[in-house]
Amino acid sequence: MKRKHYGKYIVRWTVTLLLLVLIVAGAVWIPRLLHIFLTSTGRQPPDVPDTQDYPVQGADVSYYQGNIDWNVLESQGISFCFIKATEGIDHSDTQFRQNWSTAQDSGIYVGAYHFYRFENSGREQAENFMQQVPVTENTLPPVIDVELYDDSGILPDVQETRDNLQEMLDLLEEHYGVKPILYAAPNTYRKYISCFQ
């Protein structure tokens, strides 16, 4: 009698485990399959802007996306991409060199971006970026990604931030021979960047 009860226990746990595996696999693969289906049928996935309204489509990538298949991006209509290179004064993206190298062989225009850290000087951040990103013909201008990231509610000093950004902009423009692009959310733009117009 114990063996019969033990057999039911094994069956229940096996079925439960299989259901759990199917739920996890579904959570991972359903969004990917939906994206593939929508793209292959000519429809836009929900998080992609309509090509009628925005005919030029781009992307940004970092270590977070892993290895990039540039042919797939190109087949999805991506015509330009910014690759994360650096952050602050001493961080470089672990995938940058590989992404930069392999992207050069694709038909996608590429550029590099730097994640700005408010607590670091503009000069040191520019130096970090310039050490990692080579001066290369036919690449997009460098980008400085300026985002508020501290949840403490204490905002960085406006004038100090503007001074540091100006120093970084000047150094990057001098080094690469082109004006850098500033990327920011609307609130950050209004508070820290609108003065650069």
Q: Where would I find each of the regions flagged by the language model?
A:
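Ser/Thr/Pro/Gly-rich low-complexity linker/stalk segments immediately outside membranes or between
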Residues: 32-54
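Aromatic-lined carbohydrate-recognition surfaces of secreted/lumenal glycan-active proteins
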Residues: 173-190
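A general secondary-structure junction signal
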Residues: 17, 146, 184-186
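Residue-level detector of anion-binding/catalytic polar loops
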Residues: 79, 109, 179
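Substrate-binding cleft/loops of secretory-pathway carbohydrate-active enzymes
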Residues: 190-197
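N-terminal Sec-pathway targeting helices
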Residues: 1-27
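Short hydrophobic alpha-helical membrane-anchoring segments
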Residues: 21-36, 173
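Substrate-binding cleft of extracellular glycoside hydrolase catalytic domains
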Residues: 43, 51-74, 83-169, 173-175
